[in-house]
Amino acid sequence: LFKTLASLELAQNAPLRQVVVKAAFTDANNYMKDGILLRQVVNAIDDAVDFTEYKERHAFGEIYETILKDLQSAGNAGEFYTPRAVTDFMAEMLNPKLGESVADFACGTGGFLTSALNLLARQVKTPADQELYSKSIYGIEKKQLPYLLCITNMLLHDIDNPQVFHDNSLEHDVRDYRHKEDGQFDVVLMNPPYGGS
């Protein structure tokens, strides 16, 4: 399955969901020896959570956030994740507004992005606001596992087509990244990518 997903042939105008699947599995290794166990895990989650219900999806998101806290300490290839209290504080200080773009060029599992989304979610009142909310974030993550976790995090925060990319932002000119038509980002909320390889 991993090899098949990593080698998907994509049309030039492929939907972002297809691009995300290919990118997520390109560098992935399958350490699970038993496919039946994976199926059981998927079935258990599917039976327990109705992802069409906001409250259940939100509760699952909180569980997911708790699991991600385990990654906040060093030890995974020298990676450091910013504590949630810090990401929340920084987002509150920058106070992004609905309609502004928020970028994190070393987004890890999406801590800064979700802190910004939590502030933006309070401003959503109409379907038009929801559309602005869903297009407000932009992220780049070099490593495959944090990238996958970030995509999952965005989906749990009602971002159906996350503008999060599997890439190394240090290998490109920051001006090459475009979000809005004018190529500008309103808010850059991030820590530099120190540590890791």
PLM regions: where:
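Non-catalytic, mostly N-terminal accessory regions of nucleic-acid modification and defense proteins
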Residues: L1-L98, F165-V174
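Conserved S-adenosyl-L-methionine
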Residues: E79-M190, G195-G196
